[in-house]
Amino acid sequence: MPEGHTIHRLAARHAELFAGDKVHAASPQGRFADGAARLSGTVLDGTEAYGKHLLHHYAGELTLHVHLGLYGKVTDGPGEPPPPVGQIRLRLTSDGSRSRRGGRRAELESSDDRHWLDLRGPTACELLTPPEVAALRDRLGPDPLRADADPERAYARIRRSTTPLAALLLDQTVVAGTGLIFVVEALFRAGLPPLLPGRKLTPAGWAELWADLVALMTVAVERGRIDTVRDVHLPEAMGRAPRVDRHGGEVYVYRRPGVPCHVCGTEVSRGALAGRNLYWCATCQAG
């Protein structure tokens, strides 16, 4: 499942391509036909990401809510869209009516100002009213990538809980946007065992952990991949081979079970928590 940085990148991309334009919406698959009909002809006012949720805000207080889930995928391109292939839940095309405003928009390599977007396989694709958008935000924890995030709201949950810290950080009602990679890597960098009960995390420990999540996720937005390894542990600094993994990026423990820790040489451990794999270093994260 895409982690929060991916959704923030999509929100920025869609604003760049479509904000200020009227859009034509269609559902080639048919499952979002009514919603697409309501969107067609409206102007996209702006976009935002909240955790793993993507929101398009249209004129007339229409909000498109998308959650990609495990299988969702978004593609886009310039000009006329290609013939529909596969199960396209939603296709958006812009009419190119907005004037060029310079900046990154002017850098787009396109023969005209029109663009298209295809959404396939999302867990959620729906229109929300303003109260429903507010309810969605209210049920999510703070998002480390948002300026309005209140980390103390998350810590209020964590410090009262006996639930393992890794499980709390994966709970989107506690912290929004964090997935397994960010969680296991941030815990490693903080030297915290993933099974540490939440109530044992000190205020200072939480402040450090939150700040590191903000930093790691911000870098991931900028680079388009998750890199968590400090400079001293990069391949060129250690004289080791780069990581080869479909997720890309350099990490400490994620999907590295049985191989030496970059810091201490202990074999990275793997365990399970609520049906999900966990990765940690028993030496560096002794607690």
Could you describe each region identified by the protein language model?
Residues M1-G287:
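Structured catalytic/nucleic-acid-binding cores of DNA maintenance enzymes
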